[in-house]
Each structure stands twice: as structure tokens, then as C-alpha cells.
Amino acid sequence: MTGMKLFKVLAATAALVVTAGVAVSEPYDDGQSKGYYDVLKGKKVAFVPLSMGFDLTEGWNAGLQNQAKALGYTVDVRDPNWNVEAGVQAANGFIADKPDVLILHALDQQAYNRIVPKAMSEGINVVQINMKSVTNGDAFVGTDWYEMGYKQAEEIVKACGKDSGKNGKVAIITGQASTPTTVIGNMAFDDVFAQNPEIQIVAKQAADFDPAKAQAITSTILKQNPDLCGLLGVWDGQDTGTAVADI
């Protein structure tokens, strides 16, 4: 093979490699995912947490913002700071803005009962997370509070019930009274303890999801009941206060 022929072969091979490289570098399309991602571009998501400033909601927002940046949609957050009325106002304000998706994290089980259908009637997709209103939206992503409460109560029965050799004295530190966590969790507690009458509830008080308040309440309960067998809480953020209570 002459030098000129060799050059032509190498040039042709190089062209094929370059062409192949261009073809391979095209985004892979499985016929479904690309269309899904394309639909998200330019969409508006509105988020009303019960409050910002603690790990749970900050983590959710960080995840939303990261994905929004990657997929081309926007996330707007309005923080009611543990105030139910402020949450309702924020949600109504978002409905007027007509986002594509409204994400609600309900502090009060009843507060968004009108908000949810109102948003849906405007064509807004409503997603409720972790704590939902009585009225269902398009989707709920979160904890089954009845199941969790039931399992918690069963564990207390194992630790303090008739087969434990203990006295059965238990105290319950709940969150805010109108939250799904408390309302539904209490139903589960009652159902389990009804089947285990040896469990004696010596105190049930709300600490409003405040660790300092939980600490003070627990200290009082322990002083009044020094032989207490068990304490049942509803949220680890609040329970950090319970755990350091003084006797």
C-alpha cells in the first residue's frame, strides 16, 4: 500500500470514529424518560411547609431545589413558621398565582379542607406530604400515622405490660393537638391499650413539638410518678427534650 493510499484509509477510519463518537454522545432516549423530563421544564411548584428551620423541611426543600435546577422547573416556598392561619394565607396566595403543583404539609388536620379542593378546581395538582388534611388531594407522600402509633404502643406493651414484670405505668407526650400525627396516633394508642388494660396512662400532655416544653412536662411527670415504666412520644425532634428531662 502506497503512502497516499494508507493516508486515505486512515483518514476514512478517523472519519468513521468521529461520526460514531457523535452518534454515541447523543442523549439516550428510552421512549419514556426524556418525555417525562421535558414536561417538567418551565413548571412552577409551590411549597407550604408547616415551618422551615428544622432538618425535615429543610431537607425536603433542598431536594426539591436541587431537582428543580436539574430539570428546569422552579420551587417557591412560603414559610408559615408554625402558624396555621399563616399557612392558609400562604396556600391561598399560591392558588392565586396558579402554580402547576401545590405541596402542602398540614400542621392542622382541618385547616386545608377548603384549600385542597379549591386548588384542584383551578387545575393545580395538590400533593400533601407527611401530614395531610382530612380532604384528599391528588397524592399523599408520607407516614402511615396509625400504623406507626400502633407499633409504638405495641412496643410499650412489650416493655411495660403484663408479661414484662413491670407496673404498666405509661405517660404520653403528644405534639400539637390538631395535627394528624397526634389525632391519628392517639387513635392507634387507644386501640392497642384497650386490648391491654394493664397499661395505666398516668399522664397525656401536648408539648406542641417544642423540645423545651417536652423537657419541662416530662420532668414534672417523672417527679409525680417516680416509678413510671415508659414514655411514649410522637416525634424525635420533640423527644430530644423528653430524653434529657430531670427527675
Give names to the regions the model predicted.
Residues 13-16:
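Short, linear, compositionally biased motifs with a strong N-terminal bias
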Residues 2-11, 21-247:
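A residue-level marker of the well-folded mature domains of exported/periplasmic proteins
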